[in-house]
């Protein structure tokens, strides 16, 4: 009986701490979120539809004028 375990035969999931986080997965998810937020921010800044201030009324171009 020297090689037998006496831990009660519980399942391995019974001893898992519910507050244990896989920090590599959390870090990768955060980096993906930050990258997407950065790209969306650049698209908003570079887009002509979202202007900060400036003339709100667009000037129509008349093709008949020289």
UniProtKB/Swiss-Prot annotation:
Residues in the signal sequence: none
A biological-process GO annotation: proton transmembrane transport
Name of this chain's protein: Sodium/potassium-transporting ATPase subunit gamma
GO CC terms of this entry: basolateral plasma membrane; extracellular exosome; plasma membrane; sodium:potassium-exchanging ATPase complex
Family from the record: Belongs to the FXYD family.
Organism: Homo sapiens (Human)
GO MF annotations, alphabetized: ATPase activator activity; protein-macromolecule adaptor activity; sodium channel regulator activity
Main location: membrane
Summary of the function given for this chain in its UniProt record: May be involved in forming the receptor site for cardiac glycoside binding or may modulate the transport function of the sodium ATPase.
Classification via Gene3D superfamilies: Single helix bin (1.20.5.780)
């Amino acid at each position: 009986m020297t090689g037998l375990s006496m831990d009660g035969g519980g399942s391995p999931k019974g001893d898992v701490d519910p507050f244990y986080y896989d920090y590599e997965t959390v870090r990768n998810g955060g980096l993906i979120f930050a990258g997407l937020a950065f790209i969306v921010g650049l698209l908003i800044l570079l887009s002509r539809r979202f202007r900060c201030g400036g003339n709100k009324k667009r000037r129509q171009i008349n093709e008949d004028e020289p």
